[in-house]
């Protein structure tokens, strides 16, 4: 994820965006895997027999059937059954759909919401974490921008709903969702593979926790975030305002929106907090030696 300074500068992005061909290959693979998961074992075995027969007939016994050839042949048969569109037809529709998916309003978010302001800074495969049912739309929006998204919620129904829509929208290639109750730290089974560039938090997941537990949870999120990373705290919980968590972000910078005031100086409706992790962590060793 780019910093605000990098976005304003001329620095090139660290990662190139996906090509349309890559998106098409993902589309094909997702449809094939979805079909395999939707049929029973007997039907899958019949597909394998049909593929083996076709290979033997075409090659007239000139080569040995390998597992790779069999898998490729089965995939081709599934593509025929599904009547998947060729690349040229698929691309025309895909570009329109993806353009819509990348707008906040497509997911019910305000155009000027905190996450919308960060979208120009997001790069493909940025590692992001979205926590809480109130942050559900953020998971869709980030997935549409090719971020690696992990979604956590305490409600199984919410997680299943998000997984279903992600699949239906064709956004599931870099998406994982887990049922997880909020505690002093994130569950051990959640593995991000890299430091977090962006965290979107619905403070409602902290509403029932003690102040100490909230502090420990936020500290764990900070520990997992990379220098220069960003946390967005949404105004999604009536009983716990984003500002109530500010005390846990000592040393982090509050990123203000220059458009937060309307004409005449009237304050806009609260939209949440955007907090930036310092690029250089404090030198705790030096502080300890000074104190001693």
Predicted segments — roles?
Residues 213-229:
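A short glycine-rich, Lys/Arg-flanked "PGG" loop and its adjoining helix->strand segment in the class I
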